[in-house]
């Protein structure tokens, strides 16, 4: 069976997913598209040679009889309504982050999915599909380094635009760590604090950069995450897990080691899409396979809610300078195991 997908949102990430659905992945095809800019939807159909209907409203995509699953890649504040509509129609939905712009919105999606009685939602957190993170989790789960005690992490971007704001260091950047570190450790966060080192001269006047986010988990693991979005030298993701009897480190992407002119060097990527391109392929293929097997296994609506609650607390901590609690609702039995 070829899964027939409707895409809501034909901007950069939407077109990137259309590209992989059309040219890279197997078992699915795009049969419907929508964008707030009709020309952008038409351009996507032309560019990728789609045999797809263009709809003027995203909810029409959800309701279309030939659409079996929905891909939501529209503007963040529209996500909640489209996901809730997909659940109401009983259609599986892959939603790029954020699942909703508030934790309350995420909880409404959780409650709707629980009421429906079957998992329909997968959230677009791709790092759990990165082979480096998967290898790191295998080491942690094996017990080889003992119980994790501390994590030292960094999320560095070469530069960001003028529209990037201090809170986006949490909601756009740290959000990936909030998801993947919770997945790595298999436990929730209980508190957070944000501290500000000396500001880089490369940051705009309205942006605090870098930032250090401190997290504590339910078992007492301490995590520090450096967020530095104007580091200049490249795109660099680091994660080191300190255990009771050893240390495990996220591997860097493979690159040619160069010895030349009395110097030794390794190239560093500058584009986040290049760093995680394989993960995007794997996560969307997992969604296709999960829908066809009637068993979604990727990041759930509950994972989207957990990330939103933690992000809200981190934003509060940015403003207060204090240790802020991260208080989640009780996990429904629907999402356990």
From Swiss-Prot:
Coiled coil: none annotated. Signal peptide: none annotated. It comes from the Bacteria. Its EC number is 1.1.1.18. Keywords: NAD, Oxidoreductase. The keyword Oxidoreductase applies. The keyword NAD applies. GO terms for molecular function: inositol 2-dehydrogenase (NAD+) activity; nucleotide binding. It catalyses: myo-inositol + NAD(+) = scyllo-inosose + NADH + H(+). One of its GO terms (biological process) is inositol catabolic process. Pfam families: GFO_IDH_MocA (PF01408), GFO_IDH_MocA_C (PF02894). Gene3D superfamilies: Dihydrodipicolinate Reductase, domain 2, NAD(P)-binding Rossmann-like Domain. InterPro entries: Gfo-Idh-MocA_inositol_DH, Gfo/Idh/MocA-like_OxRdtase_C, Gfo/Idh/MocA-like_OxRdtase_N, MI/DCI_dehydrogenase, NAD(P)-bd_dom_sf. Involved in the oxidation of myo-inositol (MI) to 2-keto-myo-inositol (2KMI or 2-inosose). Belongs to the Gfo/Idh/MocA family. Homotetramer. HAMAP family: IolG. This is Inositol 2-dehydrogenase. It comes from Burkholderia lata (strain ATCC 17760 / DSM 23089 / LMG 22485 / NCIMB 9086 / R18194 / 383).
